[in-house]
UniProtKB/Swiss-Prot annotation:
The gene is secA. GO terms for biological process: intracellular protein transmembrane transport; protein import; protein targeting; protein transport by the Sec complex. GO terms for cellular component: cell envelope Sec protein transport complex; cytosol; plasma membrane. Monomer and homodimer. Part of the essential Sec protein translocation apparatus which comprises SecA, SecYEG and auxiliary proteins SecDF. Other proteins may also be involved. The keyword Amino-acid biosynthesis does not apply. This is Protein translocase subunit SecA. It comes from Thermosipho africanus (strain TCF52B). Keywords: ATP-binding, Cell inner membrane, Cell membrane, Cytoplasm, Membrane, Nucleotide-binding, Protein transport, Translocase, Translocation, Transport. Part of the Sec protein translocase complex. Interacts with the SecYEG preprotein conducting channel. Has a central role in coupling the hydrolysis of ATP to the transfer of proteins into and across the cell membrane, serving as an ATP-driven molecular motor driving the stepwise translocation of polypeptide chains across the membrane. Belongs to the SecA family. ATP binds at residues 77, 95-99, 534. One of its GO terms (molecular function) is ATP binding.
Length: 856
């Protein structure tokens, strides 16, 4: 109870502010007056005084919303809006109107003119929400942009600008005059006003979409645009204008479920397909429990000593762990993971001869996304489909570090309280549970646990049949496509008509979800997270008990279970939820099966009979908490490593920006100073230098050197003057082309070295995870190693800048075009992160051999 007592105390404070907003009566004002009031606020608002304007701005947005789209935010929605404005997470149950809630903090913060980003999980929702709320923003004089995948961008505009402006001037309202109810049904809305305030999308450039006051888009596109902006060779080509304020919809899905999944911009590599085929054959020869074992709890594979010896014989090598065989180890581990940790129709499907990943959190297909580090190719080899070439990373960032760049970050979701600690620790965001507008009356039954999966599915079909016969709609949640299809076949056998909603049928999603609350409807769906569509009850369904939710398995996260449950009982509707489980379900079998089996044996449960008790439901919740804790630990590890990389990424990107802004002379000066200082450090002692060694080290510059002074200070001054003179001569030789050429060289040098550095960092992560078992802190080791490497990379950047600049003739148009074409070839990927997981490996010496633990 303490948790919610604290939440109630927090909510109490917001009610005082709600009362203040409610006292502002704007009904007598016409739309033109409301718009002018907001213009006046815009002229006076600053980051320092923004909170003073909350009551007035929220009241204006509420009144305008009522008049142009016919929706008036409830008092609890005002609380949600204040929570979002304060940079917190608002937990709002399904159907409580999150989309409308966001309009108030969006408008308030957009008045500062720095751009507000509204982040959604897919293109469909970005377009839908921007157009749905668009009339509010347009009426208030704000521009709305939408960014979509495939580089498409739009602006929300009036369908008929003349008609819309006329309606605003004449104070035409969707909300009928004198209507005092809380909610206006569609049939009661003023049709003339609805027609006047219609909007549409106009295609614009990406940069223009970001220049709008408000920009809607997906998490992946916001992240990729940031990475792409840091690969451009002209400042004008950048599209984003900063990271001021973001509201993330389905915030738990994006900031927690996807936190281990970095965004990667990559290009083709030179690995051969034949290597993957060869190691796929080797993996097939290995025998489980003889050559390797599987730890299902940690989803890891451990090679045995016998396995290592057998592999060494097959490969005809002496030591599998010799540095020269590192690449063989990568191929082998990926092949084993492909065979024993990744399942067809669960983790991926084969579609048109390609491996397409299935999102484990939402059940959606992720076309175009590929596992990194050669894993995707290993799965292609396993399934016998065409092996696509591996990719080289040009730029990468995790969602954790991308979203932490925003000055203010907030989020909304139906389920966040269970992850409150992670939101607080990683993002500094508190979670506030927003009260529902009407009391929630859904009945959540205790779990029913069966001995076998077969018994469980038979019971599920029996329950569906019973409810179908009385006309009650049923939504069944499954954990994989495979199980959806198994249940579908069983229902077809019983002649029960039903719809299937999973990654193979995503085109029909919105249509199917809309029908899921109708009388007699039966819908099977993989994870319902991120669906973004409310299920409204059809006529006569309330009387039958509302929508029944059946869960066929508990997920690793309680949140996903709660999201499934939350599909029923929206806005005070009746509803019911039951989970049917079995001892063969993964989470129970791996984490708690023995305890439950003992209980079932004690109470002598007959075949086909379930056991249910609140204690059992609690036991399963404890198991889920344990799994959540393990996953949180992995995400924290990833963040610690990526934060080291993030500091370096920001340093490189800010240096690129410095160069893009035209500071080429200063860059060359820095390069010369660094170049000289490093040589003096190496070849001078107590103020005296080894001149011959220095001459030898300067040969790379391709310049003739006369007699050099041998004292440190004199030599430093001599070399600085010499190189600066060469630099000035080169500038004169190239004339007005120099700024462009100098910038081009500097950027190419930085980008190529950064690309190589990212590749090397992958190997460092691998190596430090092994050191962890020599009682060394892997994070500390990673920091030490990467700081040294980063310093070496900067030295190379400065050295190469000097060499290329002093030896350049003239850049041709062809070279510039080639550079632009290279940029076009890069791909955007959102890959599973397979590196931090490697930290979980266990390595032990035994008879000169090592055991290696692989974690997915």
């Amino acid at each position: 109870m303490k948790l919610f007592d604290k939440n109630e105390r927090v909510i109490k404070k917001y009610w005082k502010k709600v009362n203040k907003i409610n006292k502002i009566n704007l009904e007598s004002k016409n739309l033109t007056e409301l718009i002018n009031s907001l213009k006046t606020i815009k002229e006076n608002i600053t980051p320092e005084n923004i909170d003073e304007y909350i009551p007035e701005v929220f009241a204006i947005v509420r009144e305008v919303s009522k008049r142009v789209i016919g929706l008036r935010p409830f008092d609890v929605q005002l609380i949600g809006a204040m929570v979002l404005h304060e940079g917190k997470v608002a937990e709002m149950k399904t159907g409580e109107g999150k989309t409308l809630v966001a309009t108030m903090p969006v408008v308030l913060n957009a008045l500062l003119g720095k751009g507000v980003h509204l982040v959604t999980v897919n293109d469909y929702l970005a377009k839908r929400d921007a157009m749905w709320m668009g009339p509010i923003y347009l009426a208030l004089g704000l521009r709305v942009g939408v960014i979509n995948t495939q580089n498409k961008s739009y602006e929300v505009i009036w369908k008929n600008e003349e008609l819309a402006k006329k309606a605003l001037n004449e104070n035409l309202s969707v909300w009928p005059q004198g209507f005092n109810g809380e909610f206006l049904e569609d049939e009661a809305k003023n049709k003339e006003a609805l027609e006047a305030y219609q909007v549409e999308l106009k295609e614009i450039s990406r940069k223009e979409a970001y220049e709008c006051d408000i920009t809607y888009g997906t998490n992946t596109e916001f992240g990729f645009d940031y990475l792409r902006d840091n690969l451009v060779i002209d400042l004008e080509d950048r599209v984003q204008r900063g990271h001021f304020y973001a509201i993330v919809d389905e915030v738990d899905s994006i900031l927690i479920d996807e936190a281990r999944t970095p965004l990667i911009i990559s290009g083709p590599s030179k690995t051969k397909a034949s290597d993957y085929i060869r190691f796929n054959q080797i993996a097939k020869k290995l025998v489980k429990d003889k050559h390797f074992t599987i730890d299902e709890q940690k989803k890891s594979v451990i090679l045995t000593d016998e396995g290592i010896e057998y592999i060494e014989k097959l490969l005809n090598i002496e030591n599998l762990y010799d540095p020269e065989h590192v690449n063989k180890m990568y191929f082998l581990l990926n092949a084993l993971k492909a065979h024993y940790l990744f399942k067809k129709d669960v983790d991926y499907i084969i579609h048109n001869g390609e491996i397409v990943i299935v999102d484990e959190f939402t059940g959606r297909l992720l076309p175009g996304r590929r596992y990194s580090g050669g894993l995707h190719q290993a799965i292609e080899a396993k399934e016998g489909v065409k092996i696509k070439e591996e990719s080289v990373t040009y730029a990468t960032i995790t969602y954790q570090n991308y979203f932490r760049m925003y000055e203010k970050l907030s989020g909304m979701t139906g389920t966040a309280k269970t992850e409150e600690e992670e939101f607080k620790q990683i993002y500094g965001m508190e979670v506030v549970v927003i009260p529902t507008h009407k009391p929630m009356i859904r009945i959540d039954r205790d779990d029913l646990i069966y001995r076998t999966e077969d018994e469980k599915f038979e019971a599920v079909v029996k329950e569906i049949k019973k409810r179908y016969e009385k006309g009650q709609p049923v939504l069944v949640g499954t954990t994989s496509i495979e199980k959806s299809e198994r249940l579908s076949k069983m229902l077809s056998k019983e002649k029960i008509p039903h719809n299937v909603l999973n990654a193979k049928h995503h085109e029909k999603e919105a249509q199917i979800v809309a029908l899921a609350g109708q009388k007699g409807s039966v819908t099977i769906a993989t994870n319902m997270a991120g669906r973004g569509t409310d299920i409204k009850l059809g006529p006569g369904v309330k009387e039958l008990g509302g929508l029944l939710i059946i869960g066929t398995e508990r997920h690793e996260s309680r949140r996903i279970d709660n999201q499934l449950r939350g599909r029923a009982g929206r806005q005070g509707d009746p509803g019911e939820s039951i989970f049917f489980l079995s001892l063969e379900d993964d989470i129970i079998r791996i984490f708690g099966g023995e305890k439950l089996e003992k209980i079932m044996n004690l109470v002598k449960i007959e075949k086909g009979e379930p056991i249910y008790h609140p204690m059992l439901t609690k036991l399963i919740e404890r198991v889920q908490k344990k799994v959540e804790s393990i996953n949180f630990g992995i995400r924290k590890n990833l963040l610690q490593m990526d934060t080291v990389l993030d500091t370096q990424r920001r340093a490189i990107y800010s240096y690129r920006e410095y160069l893009l802004s035209g500071n080429i002379d200063e860059h060359f000066n820095d390069a010369i100073d660094d170049f000289i200082e490093r040589r003096l450090e190496e070849f001078c002692e107590k103020g005296v230098c080894n001149v011959e060694e220095i001459k030898e080290s300067l040969k790379i510059l391709n310049i003739s050197l006369d007699k050099l002074p041998d004292t440190r200070n004199e030599l430093k001054e001599y070399l600085k003057n010499l190189l600066m003179e060469k630099f000035e001569n080169k500038k004169k030789e190239l004339g007005e082309d120099f700024p462009k050429i100098g910038k081009f060289i500097a950027l190419r040098v930085i980008d190529e070295n950064w690309r190589q550095y990212l590749e090397e960092v992958e190997h460092v992560k691998e190596a430090v995870s092994l050191r962890a078992y020599g009682q060394k802190d892997p994070i500390l080791e990673f920091k030490k190693e990467t700081f040294r490497m980063f310093d070496e990379m900067m030295a190379k950047i400065f050295e190469q800048t000097i060499i290329y600049t002093l030896n350049i003739r003239k850049i041709t148009d062809e070279a510039e075009k080639e550079s632009e074409n290279e940029l076009k070839k890069i791909n955007t990927q959102h890959d599973e992160f397979t590196l931090v997981n490697r930290k979980e490996r266990r390595v032990a010496e035994k008879k000169g051999k090592k055991k290696l633990k692989v974690k997915r």
